[in-house]
Amino acid sequence: MEKLEMLYEGKAKKIYATDKADEVIVYYKDDATAFNGEKKGQIEDKGIMNNAITSVLFEILEKAGVKTHFIEKLNDREQLCKKVEIVPLEVIVRNVAAGSMAKRLGLEEGFKLKTTVFELSYKDDSLGDPLINDYHAVGIGATTFEELKVIYDMTAKINDTLKAVFKEQNINLIDFKVEFGRCADGTIVLADEISPDTCRFWDATTGEKLDKDRFRRDLGNVKDAYVEILKRISK
């Protein structure tokens, strides 16, 4: 397997072509951003830790019956993945009110929601990834109602699986976002990453934040939080 030209560079990753048309190499960077790119910085070894965390979690999800783009971890910063067409939507899963949802709805951060809430955002940095509903998503041609049902069903399975995994490690999964891709045959798979960049993790005993909020909110010990998540899920 040969690494070829870079196809795309995002805020946290680079995507490279390979000598196989249906496979790509994903490289994890140390760059950190928040507030739709308004705050920028670097977290030492973040790419190494997010690659490791995502690899572990995607393998767990595959075993639980969730199809993903992940094939294998290649080295500290790279993984081999199926080449997919990204659905231009983010599904945000909220088990507990925090962050923008708490602010938007006037809820105290940490409020336990009566049901898990799914939110949908349109992936467009220039627009600030606006929240939309299912009808917007279908109306603008981003997806279909049939595809959305598959995505929501997969998201529910991902949430149930990850909550159980992190509960065993004394961590509450507060919220997270996921992205999906279409394989060449139209199959929907989980794509992107699952890491402290894309999730809120709170220690179940102390309430300590173990995620990118430490960077967003200048709480300090950012790298330590990523290290702690990797340590707990690697037991």
From Swiss-Prot:
Gene3D superfamilies: ATP-grasp fold, B domain (3.30.470.20), Phosphorylase Kinase, domain 1 (3.30.200.20). Pathway: Purine metabolism; IMP biosynthesis via de novo pathway; 5-amino-1-(5-phospho-D-ribosyl)imidazole-4-carboxamide from 5-amino-1-(5-phospho-D-ribosyl)imidazole-4-carboxylate: step 1/2. CDD domains: SAICAR_synt_PurC. It comes from the Bacteria. InterPro entries: SAICAR_synt/ADE2_N (IPR028923), SAICAR_synt_PurC (IPR033934), SAICAR_synth (IPR001636), SAICAR_synthetase (IPR050089), SAICAR_synthetase_CS (IPR018236). Keywords: ATP-binding, Ligase, Nucleotide-binding, Purine biosynthesis. Signal peptide: none annotated. It catalyses: 5-amino-1-(5-phospho-D-ribosyl)imidazole-4-carboxylate + L-aspartate + ATP = (2S)-2-[5-amino-1-(5-phospho-beta-D-ribosyl)imidazole-4-carboxamido]succinate + ADP + phosphate + 2 H(+). GO terms for molecular function: ATP binding; phosphoribosylaminoimidazolesuccinocarboxamide synthase activity. The keyword Lipoprotein does not apply. The keyword Zinc does not apply. Its EC number is 6.3.2.6. GO terms for biological process: 'de novo' IMP biosynthetic process; cobalamin biosynthetic process. Belongs to the SAICAR synthetase family. NCBIfam families: purC. This is Phosphoribosylaminoimidazole-succinocarboxamide synthase. It comes from Clostridium beijerinckii (strain ATCC 51743 / NCIMB 8052). The gene is purC.
